[in-house]
Curated annotation (Swiss-Prot):
Gene giving rise to this polypeptide: rplB
Region (Disordered): 208-278
Comp. bias regions, Basic and acidic residues: 258-270
Keyword Methyltransferase attributed: no
GO molecular function annotations of the record: rRNA binding; structural constituent of ribosome; transferase activity
Bias (Basic residues) ranges: 209-219
Gene3D superfamilies for the chain: 2.30.30.30, Nucleic acid-binding proteins (2.40.50.140), Ribosomal protein L2, domain 3 (4.10.950.10)
Lineage: Bacteria, Bacillati, Bacillota, Bacilli, Lactobacillales
Protein purpose: One of the primary rRNA binding proteins. Required for association of the 30S and 50S subunits to form the 70S ribosome, for tRNA binding and peptide bond formation. It has been suggested to have peptidyltransferase activity; this is somewhat controversial. Makes several contacts with the 16S rRNA in the 70S ribosome.
Pfam families named among the record's database cross-references: Ribosomal_L2 (PF00181), Ribosomal_L2_C (PF03947)
Protein name in the entry: Large ribosomal subunit protein uL2
PANTHER family: LARGE RIBOSOMAL SUBUNIT PROTEIN UL2M, RIBOSOMAL PROTEIN L2
Family the entry assigns: Belongs to the universal ribosomal protein uL2 family.
SUPFAM superfamilies: Nucleic acid-binding proteins (SSF50249), Translation proteins SH3-like domain (SSF50104)
Length: 278
């Protein structure tokens, strides 16, 4: 992937960048692997806003991704690399030798014509999926399960990966992208390699309208609201916060306050917390 830089033909174009989509080989998705996707605009079933700053945006169809990779000992050929509007990573279309089709996250370095497979005896090759206990120490992996058979949940965004540090019986130690080291059940599966489209984070959106296309609405600062809307609101002119510490819109302390439950069951599986955590 390369970054495409636009000429400053307008204020909106100035500094705008995007992907050149050079890796994309197929423009229309596989119809049998699509599902409808309705928009909620951040509302729940009561119509109450549960996630702010969401609404509008371009219509999308959901691409059904195989995060489980449980079709063992059946080889599949990569026939296309496609764009997926629902995630930062690209996706790869597989054609299995038994005739079935599936989408997977497109790993870095995987090209059209490559072959992949999954299973306990799969080779240590980019795109292959196998249990953590069968993956050598130091190997880069992505799409990692937290529960056997549930499907990959960790390291699925563009450019992300984790590193296998070693197998210790029932558990395998893995270093995540954040620097956190945690134990994961050795029966859980992971896919070899890092997720592709690694330059996605370098894209400059460039203008507000492009954010609206993605369903993101404007965000107002609390200090410009009324006091009944935000703890920072009110006052004459540019007033200070007026409290010992910045607050969330719901009156809780923000910036630096720990939000993770210290009694969470998975806390005992974390060997070292992520970088920057106090």
């Amino acid at each position: 992937m390369a970054i495409k830089v636009y000429k400053p033909t307008s204020n909106g174009r100035r500094n705008m960048t995007s992907s050149d989509f050079a890796e994309i080989t197929k423009s229309k998705p596989e119809k049998t692997l699509l599902a409808s996707k309705s928009k909620t605009a951040g509302r729940n079933s009561y119509g109450h806003i549960t996630v702010r700053h969401r609404g509008g945006g371009h219509k999308q169809q959901y691409r059904i991704i195989d995060f489980k990779r449980t079709k063992d000992n059946v080889k599949a050929k990569i026939v296309a690399i496609e764009y997926d509007p629902n995630r930062s990573a690209n996706i790869a279309l597989l054609h299995y030798t038994d005739g079935t089709k599936a989408y997977i996250l497109a790993p870095k370095g995987l090209t059209v014509g490559s072959w992949v497979e999954s299973g306990v005896d799969a080779d240590i090759k980019v795109g292959n999926a196998l249990p953590l206990k069968n993956i050598p120490t130091g190997t880069e992996v992505h799409n990692i399960e937290l529960k056997p058979g549930k499907g990959g949940q960790i390291a699925r965004s563009a450019g992300t990966s984790a590193q296998v540090l070693g197998v210790d019986g029932k558990y395998t130690q893995v270093r995540l992208q954040s620097g956190e080291v945690r134990e994961i059940l050795s029966e859980c599966r992971a896919t070899i390699g890092a997720v592709g489209n690694e330059q996605h984070s370098l894209i400059n959106i460039g203008k507000a309208g492009r954010s609206r296309w993605m369903g993101k609405r404007p965000q107002s600062r609390g200090s410009v609201m009324n006091p009944n809307d935000h703890p920072h609101g009110g006052g004459e002119g540019k007033a200070p916060v007026g409290r010992p510490q910045p607050m969330t819109p719901w009156g809780k302390k923000s910036r630096g306050i720990k939000t993770r439950d210290s009694k969470k069951a998975s806390e005992k599986l974390i060997i070292r917390h992520r970088k920057g955590r106090k």
